[in-house]
Amino acid sequence: MSKYILEVCVDSVESAISAYNGGATRIELCSNLVIGGTTPDLELFKTIRNHIQIPINVMIRPRYGDFCYTEYEHEIMCRQVENFKNEGADAVVIGSLNIDGTLNEKQMKELIKEAGQCKITLHRAFDMCKDYFQTMEEAIKLGVDTILTSGGKQNCIVGAETIRNLVEQA
């Protein structure tokens, strides 16, 4: 049997500890999960880091809605990446798009540079891209380690064929 990764999205200390005790091998820390997730509070991260010993990936998303960020929002995101990196985040979960549904390479490069040695996950902004296969290639070239996707569908079961094709191309 192959080893799998069980990543659980959490938004509180209690849910992080429950995920850890339940066998999660890493967590994705967000706030506002009910609206798709936003950047969590730094103090929440620090408290969780003190109570669990598995990798913590941190969502960097300053607001709900689309993934097209203004320069001011991008500036905030860069600072958030720096702060979480400095506090010991294992990965940052990011995604920035252009209005035409393509990856915003300029913003992504800056966020990735700011992340330093942290691993990079491209979040579900990927599902909003106009061409998944081109976006995946761009993400790989940028140094993205992981992509979160439902294959552009409401869930991964429905999007399984697209996900399979993406895995084959990768």
Residue ranges and their predicted role:
Residues Y4-V8, I27-L29, I48, I56-I60, ...:
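Hydrophobic faces of well-ordered beta-strands that scaffold small-molecule active sites
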Residues V13-I17, L33-I54, Y72-E75, S96-G116, ...:
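Active-site-adjacent beta->alpha loops and helix N-cap segments on the catalytic face
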